[in-house]
Amino acid sequence: MAIWRKILSTDKKERVKFAVILPICDITHKYKAMAQEIELKFIVNHDAVDALRDHLQTLGGEHHAPSQLQNIYYETPDKWLRGHDMGLRIRGENGRYEMTMKIAGRVTGGLHQRPEYNVALSEPTLDLALLPQEVWPNGELPADLASRVQPLFSTDFYREKWLVDVDGSRIEIALDLGEVKAGECAEPICELELELLSGETRAVLKLANQLVSQAGLRQGSLSKAARGYHLAQGNAPRGIRPTAVLKAPAKASIEQGLEAALELALSQWQYHEELWVRGNDAAKADVLAAMGLVRHALMLFGGIVPRKASAHLRDLLTQSEATLVSEVSAITAIYSTQTAMAKLALTEWLVTKAWQPFLDAKAQAKIADSFKRFADIHLSRHAAELKATFGQPLGDRYRDQLPRLTRDIDSILLLAGYYDANAVQAWLENWQGLRHAIVTGQRIEVEHFRNEAIFQEPFWLHSGKR
């Protein structure tokens, strides 16, 4: 790693000089055809590594001893690659080098699905011209990009692998132990990745369910690259992130709205779980709120997707919530089997569209209808419910209505994305202010926000007036 660290601190001319003394392999400059990388990532509790390794040894797969992987990630000063959801690195392993470009994909929970291109190199020096033109946003390599990219951060870890077969699918299990580093900032890598080499995604999920039956794993949505970028920006503490209004595509179907709503909830869950495990105790409430958002999303679409479709998922949510509200530590709660199984169940429910087998022909037609039309109808219903509940002062009974108020606010966050953001925010602020006043016991503020909320005009299409 010493030479690679030297490379990180030198200019291009010096990198070429040092490359001369590095091992060179006999590989022609040809890129591999684009592959759709499908992998499920877990963060491993360091105390559980030995037990995990013992468990992996029982799977009967082909074992590969740990091998050192050294990676340099590149970026421009203005973060051009990140802005286009692209990731560029050079990887070194046993004297072999490979340039990889990952482009925009999809992350659901810890399941990463994104295209990537790999180019074999004879030395650890970037040559962007070797990448196919289809990689670039406009179909061609930007003229000045090669001169602007520079090393941003690095990873150095040992990877131990097991190749296993699950229901006819080939899966690579990789246990990575090491660190990601940017300048003087560093943090450990202790991860498990399940990558589908051939076969069906369901096999990855099946194997994952087997592995999370033991404590010590949590799904991680933050890739090594995402962590490296954060370190390179100074490693500032991440703050609480309020749930944003869901922005669905203009022509989204109700089914796509359901998927987007649950992905938003899962993203909030994982984001605040990361904060909590890093020592931000206030984030625990937001983890529970995100799990509540999952439930509220299921209720919102319950007129189409029957409850029995999500019965197992909701049972696991209940078990996980019970673990979180107990007095156990963040580490114990987050790495528990209950939490891991609930999060994985939600990921699997989304990835496999597990609601589909429960829909009859009528429901199939409904779920393919316009999410925009669905949103307008349900915005009016939830607003009417709020007015019916809070139309008159409730005295000492406001706290009894907090669950209903929270559910309605969550539902509106999931439905309001087609309208002007300022109008939506102004409308929501009064109901959110009412909820905060109830929670904090501010009686005068309760009545102020209640009056403001019930008399405000709708921002959405209603009764043909918009």
Feature locations, PLM:
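Function-determining surface determinants
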Residues: M34-R466
